[in-house]
């Protein structure tokens, strides 16, 4: 009882923390997300890896003027989550020119890392991690979910010293690489509230709010690395797709107890959209055949039914049932292998009538019939097996069996009741 109360208290505390975090996120200034994508806003739509429909050159969306400077409440620094939300709210937004300049430095930094790799023979990813670790060491936001890369401090120091010992003419590449990583970090930090504003729309779909933020941050990092600043569009317009894609994929991979492959999630979502559209057109629930016809070639009623079964959410057998919560879902699931009361009663009566019918036979004759017809263990034994049991030949068992059957046929009054069970 004490353990149950403790678990309930812990669950309630976790739920209250989640609510507080979301309330804190609601108080952050809204980040301009650029043009909304209705396909990605619908939680039932599929994940699609199509290329982002980018605006034409010079069409960069300047949405920062629409943002209101909402006050950020004072918070206790003892709560790291609320502290994180508070800190990202303090980072000023970037203008289009600032985004272009930072993105240019990021690109130059990546080129410099390639040059350093050619000069030193070190792996470019390793050089990038070392430079990044140095930058993150002095970052303003040090506990950003999903952004804190881990690397052995000793290894970092050794590689850093090797880079510092480069000839003077090559050190400029190290300087450019550090500037590029600093610009990358700045571009990420300035857009973290965009992740929070998008993550708020995906709560209640199987992942906690903090998990959604972490997955969204991964999408933001990807967007920074893929951003094409020369096309002159707002970074938020570009990053929104990557953030949503990362969150949607995480929900598809992690939200269910039994994971469903992403391609199957896409199929399920397409099927759900088709079913809803048919329901609106027909004014009733569509049949499997109608859904299959609307889905197109390769679909039939059986495939529709099987796909919908895959989409079903599992339910715990320990789910409480009723207002009193004193019974569980598993208590109401019948055992399909257990015979029904009627079948059990019929079987009992049949056994009694069989015993009465066999009572006119000798003990050996009755046992031979029981073994041959599977009345003892449910398996019909061969003549050889029964002969081995009695220590006689199979021919002798055949004779005993025929004699016993003739006796039963002679006593027809005894076997008449058995025929009723066949009806």
From Swiss-Prot:
Location of the region described as Sigma-70 factor domain-3 in the Swiss-Prot/TrEMBL record: 266-344
Keywords recorded for this protein, A-Z: Cytoplasm, DNA-binding, Sigma factor, Transcription, Transcription regulation
Region of interest (Disordered), residue spans: 1-76
Pfam family, one: Sigma70_r3
Molecular-function GO term, any one: sigma factor activity
Residue stretches of biased makeup (Acidic residues): 21-70
PROSITE patterns referenced in this protein's UniProt entry, alphabetically: SIGMA70_2
Segments of the chain annotated as binding DNA: 383-402
Motif range (Interaction with polymerase core subunit RpoC): 211-214
Principal subcellular localization: cytoplasm
One GO-annotated biological process of the protein: DNA-templated transcription initiation
Subcellular location: Cytoplasm
Sigma-70 factor domain-4: annotated segments: 357-409
Ranges for region Sigma-70 factor domain-2: 187-257
A GO CC term attached to the entry: cytoplasm
HAMAP family from the UniProt entry: Sigma70_RpoD_SigA
Known partners and oligomeric status: Interacts transiently with the RNA polymerase catalytic core formed by RpoA, RpoB, RpoC and RpoZ (2 alpha, 1 beta, 1 beta' and 1 omega subunit) to form the RNA polymerase holoenzyme that can initiate transcription.
PANTHER family xref list: RNA POLYMERASE SIGMA FACTOR RPO, RNA POLYMERASE SIGMA FACTOR RPOD
Function: Sigma factors are initiation factors that promote the attachment of RNA polymerase to specific initiation sites and are then released. This sigma factor is the primary sigma factor during exponential growth.
Family as reported in the entry's similarity comment: Belongs to the sigma-70 factor family. RpoD/SigA subfamily.
Domain notes: Contains 4 domains, connected by flexible linkers. In the active conformation, the domains are in an extended conformation, each making extensive interactions with the RNA polymerase catalytic core. In the autoinhibited state, sigma-70 factor domain-1 packs closely together with sigma-70 factor domains-2 and -4, contrary to the extended conformation that is seen when the protein is part of the RNA polymerase holoenzyme.
Protein name in UniProt: RNA polymerase sigma factor SigA
Source lineage: Bacteria, Thermotogati, Deinococcota, Deinococci, Thermales
Name of the coding gene: sigA
């Amino acid at each position: 009882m004490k353990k149950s109360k403790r678990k309930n208290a812990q669950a309630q505390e976790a739920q209250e923390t989640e609510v507080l975090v979301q309330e804190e996120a609601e108080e952050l200034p809204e980040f301009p997300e650029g043009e909304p994508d209705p396909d990605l806003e619908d939680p039932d739509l599929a994940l699609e890896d199509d290329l982002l429909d980018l605006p034409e050159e010079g069409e960069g969306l300047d949405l920062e003027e629409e943002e209101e400077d909402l006050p950020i409440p004072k918070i206790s620094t003892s709560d790291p989550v609320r502290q994180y939300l508070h800190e990202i709210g303090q980072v000023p937004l970037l203008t289009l020119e600032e985004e272009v300049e930072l993105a240019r430095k990021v690109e130059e930094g990546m080129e410099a890392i390639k040059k350093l790799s050619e000069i030193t023979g070190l792996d470019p990813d390793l050089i990038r991690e070392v430079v990044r670790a140095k930058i993150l060491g002095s970052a303003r936001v040090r506990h950003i979910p999903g952004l804190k890369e881990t690397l052995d401090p000793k290894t970092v120091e050794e590689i850093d010293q090797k880079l510092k010992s480069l000839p003077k003419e090559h050190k400029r590449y190290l300087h450019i690489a550090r500037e590029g990583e600093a610009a990358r970090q700045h571009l990420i930090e300035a857009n973290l509230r965009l992740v929070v504003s998008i993550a708020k729309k995906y709560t209640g779909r199987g992942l906690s709010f903090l998990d959604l933020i972490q997955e969204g941050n991964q999408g933001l990092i990807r967007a920074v690395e893929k951003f094409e600043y020369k096309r002159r569009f707002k970074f938020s317009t570009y990053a929104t797709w990557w953030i949503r894609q990362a969150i949607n994929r995480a929900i598809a991979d992690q939200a269910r107890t039994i994971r469903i492959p992403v391609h199957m999630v896409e199929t399920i979502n397409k099927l759900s959209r088709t079913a809803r559209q048919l329901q609106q057109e027909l004014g009733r629930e569509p049949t499997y055949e109608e859904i299959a016809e609307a889905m197109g070639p390769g679909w039939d009623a059986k495939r529709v039914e099987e796909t919908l079964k895959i989409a079903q959410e599992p339910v715990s057998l320990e789910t409480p049932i009723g207002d009193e919560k004193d019974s569980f879902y598993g208590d109401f699931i019948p055992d399909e292998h257990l015979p029904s009361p009627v079948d059990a009663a019929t079987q009992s009566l049949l056994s009694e009538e069989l015993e009465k019918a066999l009572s006119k036979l000798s003990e050996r004759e009755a046992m031979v019939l029981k073994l041959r017809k599977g009345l003892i263990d449910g398996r019909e034994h061969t003549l050889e097996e029964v002969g081995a049991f009695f220590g006689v030949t199979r021919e002798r068992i055949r004779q005993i069996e025929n004699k016993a059957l003739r006796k039963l046929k002679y006593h027809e009054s005894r076997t008449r009741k058995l025929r009723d069970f066949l009806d």
